[in-house]
């Protein structure tokens, strides 16, 4: 079993074929998520073409969601520019910067809306918040830690 610390957004209604800009305009709330993964089940599921059905048994969300204005200057270019702290068995293991997402939330939402209407209340996740390694004297280190166990094992 693995955890994945993520940022998520809750959308309003959006029509199929929406642009990334329209995706950003549809964001109503921001919250945190722990996207649970059963890593040993995922390879077989993907090989069968079923996707992440049994390998993703549950997702837990923060008890509070905030509007974009509550984030102030931390909300820029469709990304949350804050650190996300991850703990594992009560021990802090990650303090990763959420800003360097490969795709901003508008792009993620537009991708979702490519083949369907997106209804109010839809939740879109950032994927695991992860930061790149820093090389010092030929050795790679991850000063911000990690946001999932699989990432730690890959270090």
Task: Please place each PLM-identified region on the residue numbering.
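Glycine-enriched loop-and-adjacent helix/strand subsegments that border the catalytic/binding cleft
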Residues: 1-111, 139-140, 144, 149
């Amino acid at each position: 079993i693995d955890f994945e610390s993520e940022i998520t957004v809750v959308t309003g209604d959006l029509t199929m074929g929406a642009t990334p800009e329209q995706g950003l305009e549809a964001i109503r709330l921001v919250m945190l998520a722990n996207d649970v993964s059963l890593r040993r089940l995922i390879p077989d599921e993907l090989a069968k073409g079923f996707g992440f059905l049994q390998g993703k048994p549950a997702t837990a969300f923060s008890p509070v969601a905030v509007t974009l204005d509550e984030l102030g200057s931390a909300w820029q270019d469709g990304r949350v520019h804050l650190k996300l702290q991850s703990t594992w068995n009560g021990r802090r293991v990650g303090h990763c910067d959420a800003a360097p997402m490969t795709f901003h939330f508008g792009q993620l939402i537009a991708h979702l809306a490519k083949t369907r209407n997106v209804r109010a209340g839809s939740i879109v996740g950032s994927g695991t918040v992860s930061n790149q390694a820093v090389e010092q004297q030929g050795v790679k280190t991850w000063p911000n830690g990690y946001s999932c166990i699989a990432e730690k094992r890959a270090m």
